[in-house]
Amino acid sequence: MELFLTGVVLKPKGLKGELKVKPVTDFPESFLTRREYYIGKTPEDAVLRKVQSARFHQGFAWLVFEGAGSREGAEALVGCGLYVTRDALVAMPDDRAYIHELIGLDVFDETEGRVGKISDVLQMPAHDVYEVDTGDRKVLIPAVEDFITETDLEKGMVRLKRFKEFL
């Protein structure tokens, strides 16, 4: 089963097992409606836990899980990731994509043809940056309209302009 990270447990609050969670999703409001998460240090060791209560405050989700209703139970989850299955992911608008959908896409230049594959997506404050593996080296390309002319998930490709400027 493939799991996707949506949040990271930062610290407990109080004596009743409430956890401060940093969302790592474009849809933080989903923490208010999702009733279960897989929790673990890695996706491989994550176990399914039901949400007892949820609230959102100052950019963080505050969750209480069944079976972790004490401070000690909450402290055991600090540093763990909160994961969901593919079918539990929020649907993206047509002009957006999840990072896992972008990694592995073939990258084409308007004049040179295929130049490599996206090997990673770096999330920067201003915009994402695609790491393109050309085979010889890795090149960082800002994921903005000035450089990305087309992204087609169905065809498995991204088209760039002015790629040589990054070499």
From Swiss-Prot:
rRNA processing: is it a keyword of this entry?
yes
GO MF annotation list: ribosome binding
Q: Which Gene Ontology cellular component terms are annotated?
A: cytoplasm; ribosome
- Judging by the UniProt lineage, the source's domain of life is Bacteria
**What coarse category fits the chief subcellular location reported for this protein?**
cytoplasm
| GO BP annotations, alphabetical order | ribosomal small subunit biogenesis; rRNA processing
Q: Keyword set for this entry?
A: Chaperone, Cytoplasm, Ribosome biogenesis, rRNA processing
Q: Which Pfam families did the record assign?
A: PRC_RimM, RimM
Give the UniProt subcellular location, in the record's own words. Cytoplasm
Residue ranges annotated for the PRC barrel domain, each copy included = 94-166
Query: By its UniProt entry, which InterPro entries does this protein fall under?
Result: PRC_barrel-like_sf, PRC_RimM, RimM, RimM_N, RimM_N_sf, Transl_B-barrel_sf
Subunit annotation: Binds ribosomal protein uS19.
Domains as described in the record: The PRC barrel domain binds ribosomal protein uS19.
Outline what the protein does.
An accessory protein needed during the final step in the assembly of 30S ribosomal subunit, possibly for assembly of the head region. Essential for efficient processing of 16S rRNA. May be needed both before and after RbfA during the maturation of 16S rRNA. It has affinity for free ribosomal 30S subunits but not for 70S ribosomes.
Q: Which NCBIfam families match?
A: 16S_RimM
Describe the family membership recorded for this protein in Swiss-Prot or TrEMBL. Answer: Belongs to the RimM family.
Its name, as the record gives it, is Ribosome maturation factor RimM
